[in-house]
C-alpha cells in the first residue's frame, strides 16, 4: 500500500461521516473493500466515469476538511509526542533505582497507555 492510499483512509476515519451517502459508499467500496472502478460501476449501475468523479469529489472533500480542521495532522503530532515520552520513560526505568520515582514513572506510563488513541 502506498502512502497516499493510507493517508486517504486515515482522512476517511476522521472525516468520512461528513461525506454524502453516495460518496461514502463509493469510497468504502474502492478503498476499504478493494473494488475496481469498473466493479463499482457494475454493482451500482452507474457509469465508470460517474464512479471516478464521485470518488475524486470524496477525496477532494476529505482533503478540504483536513486543510480546514487539521485533525489528522494534530493526531499524528500527538502520537509522535507520546512515542517520544514513552521512549524517555523506558530510559528512566532502566537507570532509576529509587522505588518512589519508579512508582511515579509507572503511573505516568499507565496514563499514557490510556491516552493511546
From Swiss-Prot:
Protein role: Might take part in the signal recognition particle (SRP) pathway. This is inferred from the conservation of its genetic proximity to ftsY/ffh. May be a regulatory protein.
Entries under HAMAP family matching the protein: UPF0122
Entry superkingdom: Bacteria
Source organism of this protein record: Thermoanaerobacter sp. (strain X514)
Pfam families, alphabetized: UPF0122
Protein name: UPF0122 protein Teth514_1714
Coiled-coil positions: none
PANTHER family for the chain: UPF0122 PROTEIN CBO2450/CLC_2298 (PTHR40083), UPF0122 PROTEIN YLXM (PTHR40083:SF1)
Family membership noted in the UniProt record: Belongs to the UPF0122 family.
